[in-house]
C-alpha cells in the first residue's frame, strides 16, 4: 500500500472526488489550491484533498473510497497519514460534512442550500447545514 501526493491532472480522479462532493463546480473551488493524496493498494482505492485554512487549521475538503472498498479502513489510513504528516505544521485537522443524524458539533446553517444548485441527499435525508468535526494535532 502506498499513499502518494498528486500534483498534476487531479481531475483524472474526478470519479472518486464526486463520491464525496457530487457537484463538480464545488470540487473546482478547492481542487487546485488543495493538496491531493491517493491511496494505492493494487490500484487506487481512495483519495483525499486537504487545504490550509489559516490559523493552524488543516481541512479535509474531500475524502472518498471506491464503493467496493469502503469499510476496509482506507479512509482511516489516509487520516492517520495526514495526522502524522501535518502534526508539526498544524494544530487542528478538521472536516466538514452534512448534517446527517450521525454527525454533530459545529454547524454552518443552510450551507448546502446556499452553495449547491440542487438538493443534496444522504441516505434519503436532504442535507441543509454543514457540520465541522475537529481533531487537535
Predicted regions and their residues:
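Short amphipathic alpha-helix that is part of the acyltransferase structural core
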Residues: 1-26
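Conserved beta-strand in the GNAT
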Residues: 38, 43-64
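Conserved GNAT acetyl-CoA-binding A-motif
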Residues: 85-99
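Conserved acetyl-CoA pyrophosphate-binding loop and the N-cap/start of the following alpha-helix
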Residues: 69, 73-81
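A short, internal acetyl-CoA/4′-phosphopantetheine-binding micro-motif in the GNAT/acyltransferase core
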Residues: 63-70, 98
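C-terminal "cap" of GNAT-fold acetyltransferases
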Residues: 99-100, 104, 108-137
Amino acid at each position: 500500500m502506498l499513499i502518494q501526493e498528486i500534483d498534476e491532472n487531479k481531475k483524472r480522479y474526478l470519479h472518486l472526488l464526486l463520491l464525496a462532493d457530487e457537484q463538480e463546480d464545488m470540487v473546482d473551488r478547492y481542487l487546485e489550491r488543495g493538496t491531493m493524496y491517493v491511496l494505492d493498494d493494487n490500484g487506487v482505492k481512495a483519495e483525499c484533498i486537504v487545504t490550509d485554512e489559516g490559523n493552524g487549521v488543516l481541512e479535509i475538503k474531500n475524502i472518498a473510497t471506491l464503493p467496493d472498498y469502503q469499510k476496509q479502513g482506507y479512509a482511516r489510513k489516509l487520516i492517520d497519514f495526514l495526522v502524522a504528516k501535518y502534526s508539526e505544521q498544524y494544530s487542528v485537522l478538521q472536516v466538514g460534512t452534512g448534517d446527517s443524524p450521525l454527525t454533530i458539533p459545529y454547524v454552518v446553517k443552510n450551507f448546502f442550500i446556499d452553495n449547491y444548485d440542487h438538493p443534496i441527499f444522504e441516505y434519503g435525508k436532504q442535507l441543509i447545514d454543514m457540520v465541522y468535526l475537529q481533531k487537535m494535532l
